[in-house]
């Protein structure tokens, strides 16, 4: 990384269409901090999971694995890997795969359920 390049942070987290949470919140915060967030949604929800009924859900595990492969092929290096909501075993495996592919990246694991 060149000294003037922003730090790249892989954000492995859910994306809620409604509700002030998840990737919708962390991406602009990291960007304002001068970082380059890279979104990797584990699951897409119609709303957040706290008190708004049962949200519609779209699993992102297959997309996530394909995206990780693409980033590796491009030679992308992450300075940090941040995890948020991991909706199941496949999403946990996705985070573990990212940790294996970028062992030098700082790991920030936020457990959410």
Regions found by a protein language model. Give the residues of each.
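Ribokinase/PfkB-type carbohydrate-kinase core domain
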Residues: 3-113
């Amino acid at each position: 990384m060149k000294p003037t390049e922003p730090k790249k942070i892989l954000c492995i987290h859910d994306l809620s269409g409604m509700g002030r949470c998840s990737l919708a919140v962390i991406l602009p915060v990291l960007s304002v901090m001068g970082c380059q967030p890279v979104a990797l949604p584990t699951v897409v929800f119609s709303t957040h999971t706290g008190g708004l009924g049962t949200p519609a859900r779209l699993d992102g595990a297959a997309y996530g694995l394909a995206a990780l492969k693409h980033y590796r092929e491009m030679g992308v290096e992450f300075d940090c890997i941040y995890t948020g909501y991991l909706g199941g075993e496949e999403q946990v495996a996705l985070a573990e795969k990212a940790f294996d592919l970028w062992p030098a990246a700082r790991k920030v694991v936020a457990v959410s359920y």
